[in-house]
Amino acid sequence: MKVVEVKHPLVKHKIGLMREGDISTKRFRELATEVGSLLTYEATADFETEKVTIEGWNGPVEVDQIKGKKVTVVPILRAGLGMMDGVLEHMPSARISVVGIYRDEETLEPVPYFNKLASNIDERIALVVDPMLATGGSMIATIDLLKEKGCQSIKVLVLVAAPEGIEALEKAHPDVELYTAAIDEKLNDKGYIVPGLGDAGDKIFGTK
């Protein structure tokens, strides 16, 4: 599995700011969007372009456009919504596919409860967004669903990943690509990433 830890200074700086224990909801949301945008830049670097001719201000001009790439952004509810706008800044016409999965706090197992996928998902590149890759359960369940519906090209964008989550994802889906702003130390006994960001969903939605 291709794993890319984005080491750009802006990404590292912004993730550092997100680790502050008393960060405001407003600031956390802003940073989640900004880092999501920067991760998108990295994740789409291999998109092919083609030459097309358009009508410019002074007549026809040849420009580069992304070649035949249909994209769907797949936020995992609810925390993934906090990264979605950062992705859409670059691809405002991308279709949105929503997957609802929560993690049982006792068993740490993923529990699916909702999905609404874009049409022609089998023809699209899926950019799956979720702030945290902890145990990997929710991400694996989401990718299972996408593949069941015929999606063959999947890239995962997360703010922070744990080694345990990366290992589980690679074992289940070695053909996906993972882009993360940080690979942290480990999971604690409650399945939270250490040092991590805390509960990203609570911080994004102001329910902490």
UniProtKB/Swiss-Prot annotation:
Swiss-Prot/TrEMBL cofactor(s): Mg(2+)
Activity control: Allosterically activated by GTP.
Keyword Transferase applies: yes
One Gene Ontology MF term: GTP binding
SUPFAM superfamilies (alphabetical): PRTase-like
Catalytic activity line of the entry: UMP + diphosphate = 5-phospho-alpha-D-ribose 1-diphosphate + uracil
Cofactor descriptive note: Binds 1 Mg(2+) ion per subunit. The magnesium is bound as Mg-PRPP.
Domain of life: Bacteria
Pathways involved: Pyrimidine metabolism; UMP biosynthesis via salvage pathway; UMP from uracil: step 1/1
Keyword line: Allosteric enzyme, Glycosyltransferase, GTP-binding, Magnesium, Nucleotide-binding, Transferase
Binding positions (5-phospho-alpha-D-ribose 1-diphosphate): 78, 103, 130-138, 199
GO biological process: UMP salvage; uracil salvage
Pfam families: UPRTase
UniProt keyword Transcription regulation present: no
Sites where the protein binds uracil: 193, 198-200
The EC number(s) this enzyme carries: 2.4.2.9
Function: Catalyzes the conversion of uracil and 5-phospho-alpha-D-ribose 1-diphosphate (PRPP) to UMP and diphosphate.
Family according to the record: Belongs to the UPRTase family.
NCBIfam families: PRK00129.1 (NF001097), upp (TIGR01091)
UniProt protein name: Uracil phosphoribosyltransferase
Native source organism of the sequence: Vibrio parahaemolyticus serotype O3:K6 (strain RIMD 2210633)
Source species taxonomy: Bacteria, Pseudomonadati, Pseudomonadota, Gammaproteobacteria, Vibrionales
Gene: upp
